[in-house]
């Protein structure tokens, strides 16, 4: 098989029923197979798939392993040159697949790519989870072409060029299977959130490219599994971000970045408290505690990542403070940040 489009599902019967017909119709290429892996859903997802889409192979996992381990377990059962990790709440478009495949086939130096993500509920806007490709600042804060923190741009074609990026969104991530496993796959310990960024960092550190191909467009609902306002999402984002930094930062930067993040995370917690967001306030504090508890378990991963790394300098990990640019200099779009 050349391309396996794998949807990891958890209680997403409604999403699958809504978006699967378009996916099947728009993915008719030789060597392409759509597969649904199920994280032990308690709804009728599997029964619905067997009834409505019997041609789609199903992989049943015995419990909810989360995004990272769920995908790893599913992909070990799939033989393909390319994997496409696709969220169940993504609606593809007529010509979404060909630009991705065509580019990857002639650029062997590129490990992974993503399409342009637009918001399904606001289709003229970029979507939060990936926009037109992601970057990271000096202190570990993420932003995209088309989205800086909560400032989301309208898509007026301003980012319609193919561009190297630091990370590609897990909502629709095309990756060579060889690169996926060479980098170790998604980190099971993350459970969910930022695990695709961690994977992309490991691939970039090995001098493998990641790009956004905006000729390909998909629409993403976002928050279908875990709502943005859920304190558990806040916890996972803060904890996993710290673990990712610890795993991947060059030795020369680790101490300074982690010291700065200690103060910045404290400031974020106080801002949540000032807004009476008690759940988010406690989530940040819990994330710090969990990071300290888990840190020894990640020491071997850090050592291995540094040994495998071919470079300390990744241009798409930009050397400025996003917080300073956004809140002090009022630069709230990708274009204003980079010009």
Map each language-model feature to its residues.
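Active-site-adjacent helix/loop segment of glycosyltransferases
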Residues: 6, 206-303, 307-324, 328
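Short beta-strand/loop segment that forms part of the nucleotide-sugar
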Residues: 31-40, 59-61
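A short, conserved alpha-helix in the catalytic core of glycosyltransferases
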Residues: 160-217
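Short aromatic/hydrophobic "clamp" motif used to bind/position activated sugar donors
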Residues: 83
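Glycine-rich, basic loop-to-helix element that forms the pyrophosphate-binding segment
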Residues: 60-78, 88-90, 99
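Short, acidic, metal-binding catalytic loop of nucleotide-sugar glycosyltransferases
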Residues: 21-31
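A conserved acidic beta->alpha catalytic loop
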Residues: 22, 38-47, 63
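Conserved donor NDP-sugar-binding/catalytic core segment of glycosyltransferases
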Residues: 91-130, 134-141
């Amino acid at each position: 098989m050349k391309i396996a489009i794998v949807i990891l599902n958890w209680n997403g019967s409604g999403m699958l029923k809504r978006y699967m017909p378009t996916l099947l119709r728009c993915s008719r290429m030789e060597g392409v197979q759509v597969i649904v892996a199920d994280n032990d859903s308690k709804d009728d997802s599997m029964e619905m798939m067997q009834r409505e889409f019997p041609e789609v192979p199903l992989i049943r996992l015995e419990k909810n392993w989360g995004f990272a381990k769920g995908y790893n377990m599913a992909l070990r059962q799939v033989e393909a040159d390319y994997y496409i990790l696709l969220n169940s709440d993504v609606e593809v478009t007529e010509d979404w697949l060909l630009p991705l495949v065509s580019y990857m086939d002639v650029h062997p130096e590129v490990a992974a790519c993503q399409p342009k993500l637009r918001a399904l509920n606001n289709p003229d806007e970029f979507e939060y989870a990936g926009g037109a490709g992601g970057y990271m600042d000096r202190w570990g804060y993420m932003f995209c072409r088309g989205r800086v923190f909560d400032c989301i741009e309208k898509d007026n074609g301003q980012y319609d060029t193919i561009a190297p990026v630091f990370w590609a969104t897990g909502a629709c991530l095309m990756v060579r299977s060889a690169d996926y496993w060479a980098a170790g796959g998604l980190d099971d310990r993350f459970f969910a959130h930022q695990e695709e960024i961690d994977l992309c960092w490991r691939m970039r550190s090995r001098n493998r490219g990641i790009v956004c191909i905006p000729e390909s467009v998909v629409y993403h609902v976002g928050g279908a599994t875990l709502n943005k306002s859920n304190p558990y999402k806040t916890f996972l984002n803060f904890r996993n971000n710290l673990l990712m930094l610890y795993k991947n930062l060059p030795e020369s930067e680790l101490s300074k970045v982690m010291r700065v993040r200690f103060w910045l995370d404290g400031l974020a917690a106080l801002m949540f408290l000032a807004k009476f967001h008690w759940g988010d306030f406690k989530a940040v504090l819990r994330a710090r505690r969990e990071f300290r508890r888990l840190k020894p378990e990640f020491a071997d991963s850090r050592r291995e990542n540094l040994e495998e790394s071919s470079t300390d300098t990744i241009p798409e990990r930009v050397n400025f403070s996003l917080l300073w640019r956004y809140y002090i200099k009022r630069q709230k779009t990708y274009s204003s940040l980079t010009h």
